[in-house]
């Protein structure tokens, strides 16, 4: 219901406005006060000895940050860097922090997005709610550039480049602060970032257009790859920030979807509930982020659809040129 108020101008907003408006004002006041405390030095803000790139957003929910992080990490690896990725591990609880993600890490300990980033890139990934501690650990392990998955509002960590990802279709909704609207910070915050990446929809002036390009469906058990439109009677589910985006992609690919089920972002799946859902079709299709949580109890007819961020060559060059400039300021070199 809350997203209908934020993005769809639902009539119930008139009933909830008197309650949510003062809470939104309070949220804004607290956020401004905390940010100001870091800016004037009243609160400590960690400056790393290597470049830090923050990939975040100014709205609550998923906008496509993780594909951007993966794209950045892969490009940096191609250029000879040893990138380290920082995440707070949303929804997870590690036995110890900072936690360095590896092939044996449970998503309940590290989070689904950190595990996905590790599996896709093989990069160093560290999880800690206190992000500077994760950065320090990654530097100890040999990272020479940091990419943070989310953390735009985590001012305890200084950064050199800020990248904001925007949902190109939903944009900023009613443009109100949480909880009245989806904003973590006012839209004026965008004036101070290095890049605004628009995921789908129409990029506004000065923004970088990104599309998420789907690959072939991958079997969770065997790794076999097939075109998604060759799979019959699909049960599709997604536990991401905006599940309809995934279902729309399947529709555009001509997939034979008989059931679609959305779940909350970062939700832990009950194996029995997912198995019951799966019985409604011949095959199951899910997002790659969901696959890292489902692999331990997957069946032979379960598939996931990987997607990759894609930019124009001009925009790629813009982003990489800015990174090169920052690296030179540090006097760093590739690995």
Curated annotation (Swiss-Prot):
Give the HAMAP family listed for this entry.
LpxK
- Claim: Transferase is one of the keywords in the record: yes
Please list the residues that bind ATP.
59-66
Where does the source fall among the domains of life? Bacteria
Q: What is this protein called?
A: Tetraacyldisaccharide 4'-kinase
Enumerate the catalysed reactions: a lipid A disaccharide + ATP = a lipid IVA + ADP + H(+)
Annotated GO biological processes are: lipid A biosynthetic process; lipopolysaccharide core region biosynthetic process
The answer to whether the entry has keyword ATP-binding is yes
Q: What would be the name of the gene that encodes this protein?
A: lpxK
Keywords of the record: ATP-binding, Kinase, Lipid A biosynthesis, Lipid biosynthesis, Lipid metabolism, Nucleotide-binding, Transferase
| EC number assigned by the record | 2.7.1.130
